[in-house]
Amino acid sequence: MKKVFLDTNILLDYGQQRARHEEAETIFCLGDIGEIELYASYLSYANMGYILRDMEREAKYALIESTREGITVLSCDNQQLDAALKQQVKDYEDMLQYQCALAAGCDVIVTNNKKDFYEFCQLPFLTSEEFLLQFDYS
């Protein structure tokens, strides 16, 4: 089964019903029916808390909780932090996300902000639309 790492923006697309909500919802559904395994970093949930800081508290926590179902949340250890620091890339947060995905043995990263991943990512990284187009539904 394919291990799919979801970047923060995919979680937000799903939870906030943003422009790419339907794609994110389809990816979550594929996880729900056992076609793929979904992973995200603990950092994504910290990022979401910060991004949504101006929301009403109850609504913010409900939104974050709505993105938790069916997701294996990955932690980050000393080795991953050190690897990210060593790379000295432009977007340190994306490098931390990548290190979490790599350590978990994820097969692909799904992100709707690919630009910073080009600098370093050795795993396939696809937008939600690209992921769904290449997914074998048979």
Please annotate each region the language model reported.
Residues 1-39, 54-58, 119, 132-138:
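Short, well-structured N-terminal submotif of metal-dependent ribonuclease cores
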Residues 2-3, 70, 102-138:
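Acidic, PIN/NYN-like endoribonuclease modules and their adjacent C-terminal/linker elements
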Residues 10, 44, 80, 97, ...:
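Alpha-helix capping/helix-boundary segments
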Residues 13-14, 46-50, 82-84, 119:
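A short acidic, helix-capping loop that chelates divalent metal ions and anchors anionic groups
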Residues 21-28, 35, 42-81:
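Active-site-proximal, substrate-binding regions of enzyme catalytic domains
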Residues 39, 74, 124-126:
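General small-molecule cofactor/ligand-binding pocket signal
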Residues 40-42, 111:
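Short beta-strand segments at enzyme active-site cores
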Residues 72-115:
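Active-site neighborhoods of divalent-metal-dependent phosphate/nucleic-acid chemistry enzymes
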